[in-house]
Amino acid sequence: MKDVLDDNLLEEPAAQYSLFEPESNPNLREKFTFIDLFAGIGGFRIAMQNLGGKCIFSSEWDEQAQKTYEANFGDLPYGDITLEETKAFIPEKFDILCAGFPCQAFSIAGKRGGFEDTRGTLFFDVAEIIRRHQPKAFFLENVKGLKNHDKGRTLKTILNVLREDLGYFVPEPAIVNAKNFGVPQNRERIYIVGFHKSTGVNSFSYPEPLDKIVTFADIREEKTVPTKYYLSTQYIDTLRKHKERHESKGNGFGYEIIPDDGIANAIVVGGMGRERNLVIDHRITDFTPTTNIKGEVNREGIRKMTPREWARLQGFPDSYVIPVSDASAYKQFGNSVAVPAIQATGKKILEKLGNLYD
């Protein structure tokens, strides 16, 4: 397995403009091992490698995400983690399990909400891997909506399994916002961490927000952006009419222009994710329509953010390779984790495990 710590990928900050750099202590490098489940394009991996970890297993079923992952880390993730043949490749021992698993309801039907009640969901596979391998710690990430999903029953079941069935110390989950950790994106996610009873850990504090606020101007493309990212006058007119219709009904849905000194909305897949993060950039010099622009290029400087800007919103370094189409890149970064927020929390986990690596 190629180790990214051996090349230049992570020799620069974890994000082009973030406050998170690889740990300077050379003795920390590869001081712990971790596995990367539902790996996507490797946001968790970058964060944990920045902290000195070595990834010894990864899984991701989406072929386009696998392509991006391999281009950046040199190894192809295993596929469907629900399959026993995939689980068989997981090394017996590793220190930390990382997973950004999807939110799914459980068919509890009045049961106690235990391990077997989660069968058939992707969380079941995460829990089963924890049960089999007994890592020292785990770090799970999910959408903020998990907190109230199914009237809170989903999260309650997850915590019950982790605490009661698996015997881990699991502090109350925290809602962590990426904007507080060096990236200009209002992205709230729920973090769940846990520690094996053998570690003796019985308390945990999530990281405090940083003082520094980063805005879109800090991550804007340095060079003139290609014309293809600019909207047509016709499409802008459609967006404005669409927004007016919704506002007349009392809805807040619609396109939004992020000012240079502003913070982006959470980047998401679908649901006008790109249109909710439009920007004004007057550096355009070529107003010749491209194949994906129907009609005239607008003269107001309104454009979509580029995939590289979305990468920066998530805290990916500029050396991170984007080998896929724009459409795939938007999807991949929209589904990814915010690297600096993951890294800040990962550092807190390692501080608790610190005595194990002295």
From Swiss-Prot:
<keyword id="KW-0808">Transferase</keyword>
<comment type="similarity">
    <text>Belongs to the class I-like SAM-binding methyltransferase superfamily. C5-methyltransferase family.</text>
</comment>
<dbReference type="InterPro" id="IPR050750">
    <property type="entry name" value="C5-MTase"/>
</dbReference>
<dbReference type="GO" id="GO:0032259">
    <property type="term" value="P:methylation"/>
</dbReference>
<keyword id="KW-0680">Restriction system</keyword>
<keyword id="KW-0238">DNA-binding</keyword>
<dbReference type="InterPro" id="IPR018117">
    <property type="entry name" value="C5_DNA_meth_AS"/>
</dbReference>
<dbReference type="InterPro" id="IPR001525">
    <property type="entry name" value="C5_MeTfrase"/>
</dbReference>
<dbReference type="GO" id="GO:0003677">
    <property type="term" value="F:DNA binding"/>
</dbReference>
<protein>
    <recommendedName>
        <fullName>Type II methyltransferase M.HpaII</fullName>
        <ecNumber>2.1.1.37</ecNumber>
    </recommendedName>
</protein>
<dbReference type="GO" id="GO:0009307">
    <property type="term" value="P:DNA restriction-modification system"/>
</dbReference>
<feature type="domain" description="SAM-dependent MTase C5-type">
    <location>
        <begin position="32"/>
        <end position="356"/>
    </location>
</feature>
<keyword id="KW-0949">S-adenosyl-L-methionine</keyword>
<dbReference type="GO" id="GO:0003886">
    <property type="term" value="F:DNA (cytosine-5-)-methyltransferase activity"/>
</dbReference>
<keyword id="KW-0489">Methyltransferase</keyword>
<dbReference type="Pfam" id="PF00145">
    <property type="entry name" value="DNA_methylase"/>
</dbReference>
<feature type="active site">
    <location>
        <position position="103"/>
    </location>
</feature>
<comment type="subunit">
    <text>Monomer.</text>
</comment>
<dbReference type="InterPro" id="IPR029063">
    <property type="entry name" value="SAM-dependent_MTases_sf"/>
</dbReference>
